Design a protein with these regions (language model features):
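Conserved beta-propeller blade signature
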Residues: 1, 60, 71-74, 134-137
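Short loop/turn segments immediately following the C-termini of beta-strands
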Residues: 2-5, 13, 56, 77-78, ...
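Short loop/turn segments immediately following beta-strands, especially the blade-tip
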Residues: 10-18, 88-89, 149-151
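Gly/Pro-rich loop segments of beta-rich domains
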Residues: 17-50, 62, 89-124
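Residue-level detector of Asp-centered blade-edge/turn motifs that repeat once per structural unit
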Residues: 53-69, 128-132
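Blade-level signature of beta-propeller repeat domains, shared across WD40, Kelch, NHL, RCC1
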Residues: 125-151
Length: 151
């Protein structure tokens, strides 16, 4: 993840050499900090940070050459939302940025359906508990810990 840019990077790890390879952008664009669902470089983020990998049982034995079984969820601080990035590089909104307030704002403190009602104000921390299928979100400007499930 890159706090100063609008991109999500990946670097492969070599367990024998105990080193990481060169990072590459898997979603977003370093020079365009905005908001857009999409695949790879067509997606747009604004200060993506603090992500967690969550095993997706729908992927079975895994997909792609790496047999990936995980989605990557992360905070987008300036877009006031949580993203889901799948192994194909498809970025989709997981929570936040529901309908604008009457004053045109997309942030705030609203509980409810993650895609249609929930609002955050600078989410900047994310943890996941696989035993309860629960996410815990550090909602900075709302000064609280919020929670949601994946389904």
């Amino acid at each position: 993840l890159s706090d100063n840019f609008g991109a999500v990077f990946r670097a492969d790890y070599d367990p024998v050499a105990k080193t990481f390879g060169n990072p590459s952008i898997i979603a977003g664009n370093m020079n365009d900090k905005s908001f857009k669902e999409g695949t790879g470089g067509s997606a747009r983020f604004n200060k993506p940070q603090f992500g967690v990998f969550v095993k997706n049982e729908k992927y079975g034995e895994g997909i792609g050459p790496d047999k990936d079984q995980y989605d990557f969820y992360f905070c987008d601080r300036e877009n006031h939302c949580i993203w889901k990035l799948d192994p194909h590089g498809v970025a989709s909104l997981a929570a936040g940025r529901s309908n604008e307030n009457a004053d045109g704002k997309i942030w705030g403190y609203v509980d409810g359906n993650p895609l249609h009602e929930a609002r955050f104000n600078q989410p900047a921390g994310l943890a996941y508990d696989p035993d309860t299928d629960m996410f815990y979100i550090g909602d900075i400007d709302n000064k609280g810990i919020r929670y949601m499930t994946t389904e």
